[in-house]
Regions:
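Conserved P-loop
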Residues: 114, 119-177
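Residue-level preference for the first positions of well-ordered beta-strands
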Residues: 116-118, 147-149, 200, 217, ...
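Conserved nucleotide-state-sensing and coupling region of NTP-binding domains
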Residues: 151-210
Length: 347
C-alpha cells in the first residue's frame, strides 16, 4: 500500500512491529530507570546508615578514648582525681598547688626520704577534704600496701574521713582507675580498715593511743580545735606529749609526716616542731626532722610568686616563677571574697 502524500510504499505490519518494539523499549527503559532509582535509593540509604554507624562508632571510640584519658589523668594527678569524684569541688590555685606538693610528698615517701611537710591554711579552705580524704584514697590506689594514720583534735573527725575514704575505695569508678586496690572484708571498721595488700587507714584522735599501729604516712589535720583551745597551755602541752610519745613513735623507716593546720598560737604543735628543728640544726643533730613549711594566708600580706623550687616568695627567683596573687588578694576569692574575710578579721 502506498502513502497518499509521499507516494512511498508503506508496510503496515512492519510499522506496527516497529511501534511495538519502540513501546517495549520505552517500557523497558522506564522499568530499568525505576530499578536504577530503587537501587540508587537503597544504596544511598545504606550509605547514609553506614555514615551514621561509622559516626556513632567513631563517637563511641572517641568517648571511650576520652574516658580512658580522664582515668589516666585522675591516676596521675591528685587534683584531677579530686575533680572526678567531687565535680562541685571549688578548686583554686591554692588547691592545685597543695596537690602538687602532696604528689611530691608521696614520691619522697616512696623514695624513703622521710619527708616532713607543714601546710598552714585558714579555716574552711577545703583542706580536710583534700588532705584527709582524697589524698589517702589516691595514695592507696597507687600503693595499696601503704599504712596511713589520720589524726585530728577529735577522733570523730578522722573516723568520718575514714568512712569517706573507704567508700571511695569501694566505688566502681575508683575501681576502674585503681583495679588492684581492694578492701579487706575481714577488717573494715570505720576506725581502722585494711586493703587486701596489707595497707590501710587508721583514724586517731589527738591524745588517744595508737597501740600496735604504724604508718608510712602520718597525717595530722588540725590538732587543736580553735583559738580558745590554742590559748590553753595545758591543751598545747597535751598535743605535744601525744605527738612526741605516741604519734611520732609509730613512724616506719622513711615514713612521711604531714601537718596541716590553722595557726592559732605561736607555741602550737607547728611552732614547737619548728623550734625543735632550729635547735637540732644549731646543735648539729644528724637525721633531724627537716620541715618544709608552706603558708597560705587568707589575705596575701605581700605579692606571691611560686618558684620552680616550690617556695612562695614576694619576688620571683627566676623568670619561670608564676605569680599567683597580689598583696591584699584573697586566697580563694570564689569561695571567700576579700570583703568577707575583712569582716571576719574585724570580728
Amino acid at each position: 500500500r502506498g502513502d497518499f502524500y509521499s507516494g512511498q510504499h508503506v508496510c503496515l505490519s512492519c510499522k506496527a512491529k516497529q511501534q511495538a518494539a519502540q513501546l517495549a523499549a520505552k517500557t523497558e527503559a522506564r522499568r530499568l530507570a525505576k530499578e536504577t532509582t530503587k537501587v540508587m535509593r537503597a544504596q544511598a540509604k545504606k550509605q547514609a546508615y553506614d555514615r551514621k554507624y561509622d559516626a556513632e562508632k567513631r563517637a563511641q571510640v572517641s568517648a571511650q578514648d576520652a574516658e580512658l584519658a580522664r582515668r589516666t589523668l585522675a591516676k596521675r594527678r591528685l587534683i584531677e582525681f579530686t575533680r572526678r569524684f567531687h565535680p562541685d569541688y571549688q578548686a583554686g590555685w591554692v588547691h592545685r598547688d597543695v596537690c602538687r606538693r602532696l604528689e611530691q610528698f608521696l614520691q619522697d615517701v616512696v623514695d624513703k626520704k622521710s619527708p616532713r611537710l607543714m601546710l598552714f591554711l585558714p579555716p574552711r579552705s577545703g583542706k580536710s577534704a583534700l588532705v584527709s580524704v582524697n589524698f589517702p584514697a589516691w595514695i592507696l590506689g597507687q600503693h595499696p600496701e601503704m599504712e596511713i594514720i589520720s589524726s585530728s583534735y577529735a577522733v570523730s573527725l578522722p573516723i568520718t574521713f575514714s568512712r569517706k575514704v573507704r567508700e571511695l575505695v569501694q566505688d566502681p569508678a575508683y575501681q576502674s582507675i585503681f583495679p588492684a586496690t581492694h578492701l579487706d572484708r575481714s577488717s573494715a571498721s570505720a576506725e581502722a580498715w585494711l586493703t587486701t595488700q596489707g595497707g590501710g587507714y587508721v583514724a586517731s584522735g589527738v591524745g588517744t593511743g595508737i597501740t600496735g599501729k604504724g604508718f608510712n604516712i602520718g597525717i595530722i589535720d588540725d590538732p587543736i580545735k580553735d583559738a580558745e583551745e590554742a590559748d590553753s597551755e595545758t591543751v598545747r602541752e597535751k598535743v605535744w606529749d601525744w605527738y612526741s610519745s605516741t604519734f611520732y613513735t609509730r613512724a616506719a623507716p622513711g615514713a612521711g609526716i604531714l601537718v596541716v593546720l590553722t595557726r592559732w598560737h605561736d607555741a602550737d604543735l607547728a611552732g614547737k616542731l619548728l623550734q625543735r628543728m632550729k635547735e637540732d640544726k644549731a646543735e648539729g643533730v644528724s637525721n633531724l626532722d627537716d620541715w618544709q613549711v608552706i603558708s597560705y594566708p587568707a589575705i596575701a600580706v605581700t605579692d606571691e610568686w611560686v618558684n620552680v623550687d616550690g617556695t612562695i616568695t614576694e619576688e620571683p627567683k627566676t623568670p619561670q616563677a608564676i605569680k599567683v596573687r597580689n598583696k591584699g588578694e584573697a586566697l580563694h576569692p570564689e569561695r571567700f571574697p576579700v570583703e568577707r574575710l575583712e569582716r571576719i578579721k574585724q570580728t
